[in-house]
């Protein structure tokens, strides 16, 4: 992560932000219909869009099926967001860990 020059300095993107800002506006569907097609409540969809809930493996399967891009895209986006958000918060703890010699 820290070694990836492409990700340095960029704010992590929650999958909900991508859905809210780019994906859903491009669809000609109300959010209620999207939630219905995903088989989830409107509240669950809104919680993801508002970045209050993560994209779980089950949700990634639903999103991947709905958008046709598979679950890995959504899980990878969530994983990257989680790691990039958590790593700075854990910097001291991580610095104190002594790695195993290779």
Regions found by a protein language model. Give the residues of each.
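Short, basic-rich loop-to-helix N-cap that marks the start of a DNA-contacting helix
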Residues: 52-65
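Residue-level detection of the helix-turn-helix DNA-binding "recognition helix"
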Residues: 39, 50, 79
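Short alpha-helical DNA-recognition segment
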Residues: 29-47
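A short, Lys/Arg-rich alpha-helix, primarily the initiator
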Residues: 5-29, 73
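The alpha-helix within a helix-turn-helix
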Residues: 24, 35, 64
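Short, charged recognition helix plus adjacent turn
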Residues: 75-102
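Alpha-helical structural signal
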Residues: 20, 42-45, 71
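Intrinsically disordered, low-complexity and often Lys/Arg-enriched segments
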Residues: 1-7, 102
């Amino acid at each position: 992560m820290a070694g990836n020059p492409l990700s340095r300095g960029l704010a992590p993107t929650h999958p909900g932000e991508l859905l809210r800002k780019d994906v859903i506006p491009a669809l000609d569907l109300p959010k209620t219909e999207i939630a219905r097609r995903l088989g989830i409540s409107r509240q669950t969809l809104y919680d993801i869009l508002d970045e209050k809930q993560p994209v779980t493996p089950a949700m990634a399967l639903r999103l991947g099926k709905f958008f046709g891009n598979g679950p890995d895209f959504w899980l990878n986006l969530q994983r990257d967001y989680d790691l990039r958000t958590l790593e700075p918060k854990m910097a001291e703890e991580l610095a104190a860990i002594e790695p195993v010699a290779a």
